[in-house]
Amino acid sequence: AIVAKVDVKEVAERAGIPDIVRESTGELAGSAVDVLRRQIVAIDAIASGTAYRLTGRDPATRPTSPSGLEEETGAGRKGRGQVTGHYAGPLSRLSAFLIDTAIVWFSFLLTIAGIAFIVDVFSRGETPPATDLGPIGLAVLAVWAFLYMWASLTIAGRTLGMGIVGIRVVDRQGEPLSARQSLIRTVVFPFSFLIFGLGFLGIFISPERRTMHDAAAGSVVVYDWGDRTAEMPAPLTRWVSRRAEELATIDSE
């Protein structure tokens, strides 16, 4: 009888159990994403470091972040290197691009399908299929993609894909992009694909990992995981530390 009178919901709320569950769920989801992000950061470091070394330069001498941006260095949790504010590498940027491409396509097709359905209702089935874009449809898609990227960079400094991967676009001093810089970067972006994508070569060989559209807009891309520290795996962190010590020894001699 006593148990029946107990308000279990009220007791749980007073104990903070719902908050604990929400925080735990959020931490687990965030941890799963961060595991993938760390592996991407590791591949970034290996790929860009190898390419930089092929140009006759040591990756250890490469700048790590914009001059005006506060960066995190050294080993963090469990010996993982902290890379918040460091220049982002090729796989991070490619992953963000692929996610954004999917977002643009699906959101565009869903919108077109919705409009086509409404028109179809009033036109008695005389409209073409929603997937049959044609020249006008492709032009509208291009405008859709342009607005998505420009608005995202202007408002948040990153697109949805960049946010998922954990990167952000800033100017060369680490400050947020202006609307003008976001516009220039968005307009020039397609031209980086010309001549077999030579505009992206700078990600591998440029000290600041800048593409053609970055150079035009005066922008760079850095790691930013929001309220969590961007990290690289512990084994790679140890290797980087040993390499830095070797260079310091050589310089002292």
Language model features with spans:
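Amphipathic, rod-like alpha-helical scaffolds used for oligomerization/assembly
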Residues: 1-79
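Voltage-sensor-like transmembrane helices and their cytoplasmic interface
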Residues: 7-10, 16, 162-168, 217
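Short, small/hydrophobic-residue-rich motifs at membrane-helix boundaries and re-entrant hairpins
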Residues: 25, 72-193, 223-253
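Hydrophobic alpha-helical transmembrane segments and immediately flanking/interface helices
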Residues: 122, 201-227
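Short helix-terminus and kink motifs of transmembrane alpha helices
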Residues: 149, 153-154, 158, 162, ...
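Alpha-helical membrane-embedded segments
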Residues: 191-201
